[in-house]
Amino acid sequence: MMQTNLQLDLAFNYLENTGTNIFLTGKAGTGKTTFLKKLKETSPKRMIVVAPTGVAAINAGGVTIHSFFQLPFGPYIPGSEMASGQNKSYSHKFSRDKINIIRSMDLLVIDEVSMVRADLLDAISDMLRRYRDRNRSEERRVGKECRS
């Protein structure tokens, strides 16, 4: 039987009942992965789980950030031709299905967020702003930090 963790229960209830962001961190073995599994199994929210590496994505039951957002592996420079969609060598076009997934998503979980470069977070933010309803005040994100 799984032991109850009051802090994780509080975080779960907070996520379920608010639309605000949380940053979940903790040492190895504190229940972060169990929390994510419980969240995926029991939450009615439509969520996407991404991670910076293939191994982290598999462990979280998600996909890589680059795969989901169709990002190149080089650095992302806000305001650049790539960011504005003017770079002909990098045509950023999501399928209608992908756009619908992004627009209908209630929760974006970024597992192992401490491994994500700042420019990649900018790219994610820009993609969400571009494809989601612009009337929403914030994208809803959850980051689970990697600590060994």
Tell where the protein language model's regions lie, with residue ranges.
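Conserved ATP-binding/catalytic motifs of P-loop helicase motor domains
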Residues: 1-148
